[in-house]
A protein has these predicted regions:
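Active-site beta-strand termini and strand-to-loop segments that position acidic
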Residues: 217-220, 356-358
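Linear, non-domain "peripheral" regions
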Residues: 5, 22, 26-125, 295-306, ...
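Active-site neighborhood of thiol-dependent amide/isopeptide-bond enzymes
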Residues: 148-219
Length: 358
């Protein structure tokens, strides 16, 4: 989910965040204030003190200023006969802060304790589990699988958000929540994937819609969409790692209302070369393909079978009817005692069939 800012305007002075250096003090017009704020944010300063000596609309300024990189800011102000003294305090977005620390090690001392823990934990994970000899695709898959298995979607936080309840606890929106608590909403998943992929040498970007967040990953010279959050939820549902939202194109991804990017200037994702199902022969173009793929997988010993179904919204599939052939499967003389399935729909292109054998 998107970051949420809280704004406080009070008539007394207090410092709510520890400044990493003595707060800068400047006398500012609107333009000078904007420059001072941009410099403070670029330097990850904890605080900035500004004296306004020009008459301008502060509310309009705040509405228009781009606080990119800041997860929370607070403004405390007091007006004298001559000017307005403003003290700005900042806390920084997890990905912004860690990116700065990776670009310049001196910024590590400016990370919050939790951000420092995330960076340390991710470095240890990459060192232990992701050797340099792996391809970027293999690194991405390993990270995807790890997060799908070890992180669960935070339903309670999501329900609160949908109900308009805004909590002071932003942990579920962070990589810290995903990696240390094992629960997160989409932003936490995307942040964790970003840190792990970046430390593994895989270029990626966080993509935001109005209600969701995921990653755009560069593999070779092409880009693909990766939504670990939705694959993790399907993994919990089916009991096996799912790849429904693993390396999709723009066309495939943006069919879903939640996947309408608001980011400007994203590179196009137009290759199916890294789609898991397409590369493994698990792509069905019609019902005959569905039967062929499931039968072959069953005979090979698979009991939890997922496949991509093209154009499933166009054709009149009745999966309760169309999967009756499963009862006739007898791999190694074993019979199907029961089976369950998760069918394709408006928000997924994969069919998952789980077989229980006698």
């Amino acid at each position: 989910m998107l970051n949420r800012f809280k704004i406080y305007a009070v008539v007394f002075l207090t410092a709510l965040f520890i400044a990493f250096a003595p707060p800068a003090e400047v006398s500012a017009s609107a333009g000078e204030l904007a420059d001072a704020l941009r410099t403070a944010i670029e330097n990850m300063d904890g605080s900035l003190t500004v004296y306004e000596d020009a008459d301008f609309d502060l509310d309009a300024f705040v509405e228009e200023f781009d606080f990119a990189g800041v997860s929370k800011w607070e403004l405390n102000s007091a007006r004298s006969q001559r000017d307005l003294r403003m003290v700005w305090d900042f806390a920084y977005n997890e990905v912004y802060a860690i990116r700065k620390a990776l670009e310049d090690a001196s910024f590590e001392q400016k990370l919050s304790p939790r951000q420092a823990q995330v960076l340390s934990e991710c470095r240890a994970f990459v060192k232990k589990n992701i050797p340099d000899k792996l391809t970027d695709y293999e690194k991405e898959k390993l990270i995807h699988d790890y997060l799908c298995v070890n992180v669960s979607f935070d339903e309670e936080t999501e329900e609160e958000r949908l109900s308009g309840i805004i909590s002071d606890d932003i942990t579920p929106y962070t990589a810290y929540g995903a990696l240390f608590n094992g629960t997160a909403v989409c932003e936490g998943y995307a942040n964790a994937a970003w840190v792990l992929l970046t430390l593994s040498g895989v270029e990626n970007h966080i993509v935001n819609s109005d209600t969701h967040a995921w990653n755009l990953v560069k593999l070779g010279s092409r880009y693909c969409h990766l939504d670990v959050t939705w694959d993790s939820s399907e993994t919990d549902l089916t009991g096996t790692i799912q790849y429904t939202y693993f390396n999709l194109t723009d066309e495939q991804m943006t069919r879903y209302p939640e996947h309408q990017p608001v980011n400007a200037g994203l590179p196009p994702a137009d290759s199916e070369a890294y789609n898991m199902y397409f590369n493994s022969g698990m792509r069905a173009g019609n019902l005959a393909d569905v039967e062929r793929i499931i039968t072959a997988a069953c005979e090979a010993g698979e009991r939890n079978i997922s496949l991509w179904v093209d154009d499933h919204l166009t054709f009149d599939y009745d999966w309760q009817r169309d999967l009756q052939f499963v009862w006739d499967l007898t791999p190694g003389g074993n019979y199907v005692e029961s089976f369950m399935f998760v069918e394709p729909g408006a928000d997924r292109d994969t069919l998952t069939v789980i077989l229980y054998m006698r």
